[in-house]
């Protein structure tokens, strides 16, 4: 609780960053390569936390270049050169693209067959000059589902994440997250999601509890609710 964030291990920094992203109880959680540089044991514990969050009905979008992690999602989109090459369960994607992907141990649990879509994406595209970083991707994600973006570095995963979280405006296409259009209602999107970037977004000079309270203020949580929510998240850590 009182340790500086900069003094924590990689695994604990990861858990703290996740707690900060959860402080305002979001409907959707975006995780951009959340286990980069983290040891295998901490990585396993992190995915166990994600499964518990899914049981609470939180929809999770996670990007990763690691096949073992992608296999723990309910469904994955394989992204290559800015385009989605296929969307299916992890085992089917690995079989379909066996010539590109190297199969690893499969861990797969199906989400409930719920037709309530929290994320709907149609033809979403992002160009930087003549370079197309994300090329007309389309998919839907159900409530309470863990959906993964699998792809190598530079495939377009982070750019797609930034558009879906309202941080980058699409060049073409449309997307709705938590009921809001990402192009025209980006601030509403931000208020209803949690986002954990590759760098964990922590303030290393602040203590653990100070980081959580800071993010509570950023998300506009009423002052009387901040302390109990902080204590609740510290217990999870």
PLM regions with names:
Residues 29-32:
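Catalytic Walker B motif of ABC-type/P-loop ATPase nucleotide-binding domains
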Residues 4-8:
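Conserved ABC ATPase signature
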Residues 25:
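Conserved catalytic motifs of ABC-family nucleotide-binding domains
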Residues 87-88:
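ABC ATPase "signature
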Residues 1, 213, 217, 222-237:
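Conserved ABC ATPase "signature" region
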